[in-house]
Amino acid sequence: GTTVVAHKQQSVNRLLYKVTSHIPDTFFSLK
């Protein structure tokens, strides 16, 4: 149902947030 889709979307958003929040650290350390 829609709840499963919403739950998947939420976990995907959380994963994306984790990844994007780590990007600046790695980017600046590479620089």
UniProtKB/Swiss-Prot annotation:
<dbReference type="GO" id="GO:0005576">
    <property type="term" value="C:extracellular region"/>
</dbReference>
<keyword id="KW-0186">Copper</keyword>
<protein>
    <recommendedName>
        <fullName>Hemocyanin subunit 1</fullName>
    </recommendedName>
</protein>
<comment type="function">
    <text>Hemocyanins are copper-containing oxygen carriers occurring freely dissolved in the hemolymph of many mollusks and arthropods.</text>
</comment>
<comment type="similarity">
    <text>Belongs to the tyrosinase family. Hemocyanin subfamily.</text>
</comment>
<keyword id="KW-0813">Transport</keyword>
<keyword id="KW-0561">Oxygen transport</keyword>
<dbReference type="GO" id="GO:0005344">
    <property type="term" value="F:oxygen carrier activity"/>
</dbReference>
<keyword id="KW-0964">Secreted</keyword>
